[in-house]
C-alpha cells in the first residue's frame, strides 16, 4: 500500500501502474475538506515513488464522486474574501498537482462524477466511463460557478461552445453524450471499466497515445480564432441571459469567466475563476440556492427515516378518476407501485386513463421512455367501477370532489372494503382532516395527502396529520409519496393546511390593492419580473380557477375570521360572480386563447377591467415596492405563524413547501431564508408601516422578540 487514509487508498498494480481509490465512509464519495487533504497527501506519496509509471483513479462505490460536500459551503462562504481565496487556491493546488504528475493519468468513471468529481477527472489525461456514468458541473444551480478549475479545463477538453452549455445549464450528461463531445475517451461495460482504463495507460506508457500533447492543450490558451470567439461568446451571453434572467447571476458569470480565461494559460485562467467564484459565493442568491439544496436533503432525510417505521406499500388505489386521479395513478404506476383507479362512472375512468396515457406518450416522444415501458406502466393501472378491486390495497388515496359530505361518505364506504391495516388518505386542499376522520371507524389509519396540480409536474405533497393519525400511518404515507418521486412535508391539520393557509393572505393583499384601484396586470408584472414569482397573483388565480379560489377563500375566512374574514366584495368575488373562472372557461382576469402548440395564451381583456372599475372605481398606480410589500407581508407573517403554532415543523420544511408547492422564487430561498437575508428587524419595521391595513399585516410577539435580539430563523 502506497498510501491509506479513511477516504483514499493507493496501491501499486502490475506494470507499475498505481491505483488511487476513493473510498470514503458512507454510501458515496464527496469532496469534503478531509478528502481534499487526503488527496493532496496521496499525490505527494505517489510523486515520491519513482517506480510508478502511470496512475488510474477509481471509486469503490457505485458512484465516482458526487461533488463537493455542500454542507460545508455556507460556513465557508461566510468567511472573509482572503480566507475564501486561500481555500480556493489550496484546493486548486491539489488539482494542479494531479494534472502535473510526471506520467500519464486516467480516470475510471462509474455513476456520478459531478462538480468536484468532474473537475477531478478533467485534471487527468484520459477519461474512461462505464455505461452508468453521468458527468457534469451543476454549480450554477447553487448560484456559483465551478471552483476547482472546471471553467478552465472543460473548454480546453470539449471546446468553448460545449463547455458553455454544460456549465451554464448545470445538467448531468450521460456517458454516450460525453463521448460525443470528447469529455470521455471511451464508454465501456461496467465490468470492463478498470481494465479498459489500465490498458489505455499501458498504451500511453508505450507511447501509442500522446498523453503529453493532451495535457499541454489543457495548460494553454484556447485555440479559437478571434472572430469566432467573439461570435461564440456574444451568442452565448444572449441565450444564457434569456434563460437565467437578472435574478440568477451565476450562468452569466460563467460565460464571462470562460471568455476572459480563453486567451490565458492555466495559472492566469484559474485566477480569473477564483475571483468570480468568491464574488458569487458571497451573494444572497448563492446562500438561498445552497440553502434550498440543504433543505431538500433535510426533508428527504426525514422521509428516509420515516421509511423505517412505514408499512410497505406494494399495492395502491385512488378513488376518483379524472385528471387528478389519472395523474396520481400515473405517478404511482410509473414509479413501480401498481394502482387501482376506482370511480363510479366509466367516462371518468376513461378520462383518467387517457391522462396517464397522454403523460406517458409525451415521455416516449421526448425519448425519456419507450413504448414497452409505457405499456408496462399502463398495465400497472387497473380501472374499476367496483370497490372489490381495492381489497388488497395497502394505501387508498381518496380523490373525489372537494365536498366534505361526499368525501365523508366515500371514506366511510371504502373502510368496509379494505383490510384492517390498510391506510386511507384524503387528497384534499381545504377540508379539515379531523372533520373527515369523524366518519372513520379507524381514524388512526387515516391522514391527508394533498397533491398539487398538475401531479406529474409539482414536486410537493403535503401529508396532513390529524389528531388521531398514528405515526405508522404518517410514516407509511410519507414513504409512499417518496416512492412516487415526490417531496413530502408533514404538516398538522388546520384550515388550508400549510400551503393554502399561507397563499390566501397573499391573495388578500392582492385583493386589497385592487380594491384601491390597482391594475392586476401591472401587479402581476411586478411580482413576476421584480420579485420573481413564475406567475403573478391574477395569473395564478386564473390557472388555479376562480371558482376554486372563491371556495378556498371562504374556507380560510371561516377558519381565521379575525385576519382573513371579509367585509365586502373583493376582486375574486367579482370574477366568480361574472362566471369568469380563469383558464378553465377561457376568461378570468385575463382572456385565453390557444396558441400554435395547443397551450393557453393570455391577453389583457377590457371586460375584466370594466368589471373591476364598476366595483372599485378608477385605476390607480402603485409603486413596485408598495405592491411587493402589500402582497408579501401577509404571506410571510402567516408562514411565521404556522411555524410558531407547530403547523409546520421547521423553517427548512416551510421553505421547501413554498418553493416546491407554490413556486416561491428559488433565488430568494423561501420565506425564512428571505427574512434572514432581509433581517428580521428590518421586516418588522416594514410590516409596521402597513399594520393599519389589518390583522394580516401585524407581526407576532415572537417575531418582535427575535428582531429585538437580532436573531435569525436559520443557524449559520
Curated annotation (Swiss-Prot):
<feature type="binding site">
    <location>
        <position position="407"/>
    </location>
    <ligand>
        <name>NAD(+)</name>
    </ligand>
</feature>
<feature type="binding site">
    <location>
        <position position="343"/>
    </location>
    <ligand>
        <name>NAD(+)</name>
    </ligand>
</feature>
<dbReference type="GO" id="GO:0036125">
    <property type="term" value="C:fatty acid beta-oxidation multienzyme complex"/>
</dbReference>
<dbReference type="Pfam" id="PF00378">
    <property type="entry name" value="ECH_1"/>
</dbReference>
<keyword id="KW-0276">Fatty acid metabolism</keyword>
<feature type="site" description="Important for catalytic activity">
    <location>
        <position position="119"/>
    </location>
</feature>
<dbReference type="InterPro" id="IPR008927">
    <property type="entry name" value="6-PGluconate_DH-like_C_sf"/>
</dbReference>
<feature type="binding site">
    <location>
        <position position="296"/>
    </location>
    <ligand>
        <name>substrate</name>
    </ligand>
</feature>
<feature type="binding site">
    <location>
        <position position="453"/>
    </location>
    <ligand>
        <name>NAD(+)</name>
    </ligand>
</feature>
<feature type="region of interest" description="Enoyl-CoA hydratase/isomerase">
    <location>
        <begin position="1"/>
        <end position="189"/>
    </location>
</feature>
<dbReference type="GO" id="GO:0016509">
    <property type="term" value="F:long-chain-3-hydroxyacyl-CoA dehydrogenase activity"/>
</dbReference>
<comment type="pathway">
    <text>Lipid metabolism; fatty acid beta-oxidation.</text>
</comment>
<dbReference type="InterPro" id="IPR036291">
    <property type="entry name" value="NAD(P)-bd_dom_sf"/>
</dbReference>
<dbReference type="InterPro" id="IPR029045">
    <property type="entry name" value="ClpP/crotonase-like_dom_sf"/>
</dbReference>
<dbReference type="GO" id="GO:0008692">
    <property type="term" value="F:3-hydroxybutyryl-CoA epimerase activity"/>
</dbReference>
<feature type="binding site">
    <location>
        <position position="429"/>
    </location>
    <ligand>
        <name>NAD(+)</name>
    </ligand>
</feature>
<comment type="similarity">
    <text>In the C-terminal section; belongs to the 3-hydroxyacyl-CoA dehydrogenase family.</text>
</comment>
<dbReference type="InterPro" id="IPR006108">
    <property type="entry name" value="3HC_DH_C"/>
</dbReference>
<keyword id="KW-0560">Oxidoreductase</keyword>
<dbReference type="GO" id="GO:0004165">
    <property type="term" value="F:delta(3)-delta(2)-enoyl-CoA isomerase activity"/>
</dbReference>
<comment type="subunit">
    <text>Heterotetramer of two alpha chains (FadB) and two beta chains (FadA).</text>
</comment>
<dbReference type="GO" id="GO:0006635">
    <property type="term" value="P:fatty acid beta-oxidation"/>
</dbReference>
<feature type="region of interest" description="3-hydroxyacyl-CoA dehydrogenase">
    <location>
        <begin position="311"/>
        <end position="716"/>
    </location>
</feature>
<feature type="binding site">
    <location>
        <position position="500"/>
    </location>
    <ligand>
        <name>substrate</name>
    </ligand>
</feature>
<feature type="binding site">
    <location>
        <position position="324"/>
    </location>
    <ligand>
        <name>NAD(+)</name>
    </ligand>
</feature>
<dbReference type="GO" id="GO:0004300">
    <property type="term" value="F:enoyl-CoA hydratase activity"/>
</dbReference>
<protein>
    <recommendedName>
        <fullName>Fatty acid oxidation complex subunit alpha</fullName>
        <ecNumber>4.2.1.17</ecNumber>
        <ecNumber>5.1.2.3</ecNumber>
        <ecNumber>5.3.3.8</ecNumber>
        <ecNumber>1.1.1.35</ecNumber>
    </recommendedName>
</protein>
<dbReference type="Pfam" id="PF02737">
    <property type="entry name" value="3HCDH_N"/>
</dbReference>
<keyword id="KW-0413">Isomerase</keyword>
<feature type="binding site">
    <location>
        <begin position="400"/>
        <end position="402"/>
    </location>
    <ligand>
        <name>NAD(+)</name>
    </ligand>
</feature>
<comment type="function">
    <text>Involved in the aerobic and anaerobic degradation of long-chain fatty acids via beta-oxidation cycle. Catalyzes the formation of 3-oxoacyl-CoA from enoyl-CoA via L-3-hydroxyacyl-CoA. It can also use D-3-hydroxyacyl-CoA and cis-3-enoyl-CoA as substrate.</text>
</comment>
<comment type="similarity">
    <text>In the N-terminal section; belongs to the enoyl-CoA hydratase/isomerase family.</text>
</comment>
<dbReference type="InterPro" id="IPR012799">
    <property type="entry name" value="FadB"/>
</dbReference>
<dbReference type="Pfam" id="PF00725">
    <property type="entry name" value="3HCDH"/>
</dbReference>
<dbReference type="InterPro" id="IPR050136">
    <property type="entry name" value="FA_oxidation_alpha_subunit"/>
</dbReference>
<keyword id="KW-0456">Lyase</keyword>
<keyword id="KW-0520">NAD</keyword>
<dbReference type="GO" id="GO:0070403">
    <property type="term" value="F:NAD+ binding"/>
</dbReference>
<keyword id="KW-0511">Multifunctional enzyme</keyword>
<dbReference type="InterPro" id="IPR006180">
    <property type="entry name" value="3-OHacyl-CoA_DH_CS"/>
</dbReference>
<keyword id="KW-0442">Lipid degradation</keyword>
<feature type="binding site">
    <location>
        <position position="660"/>
    </location>
    <ligand>
        <name>substrate</name>
    </ligand>
</feature>
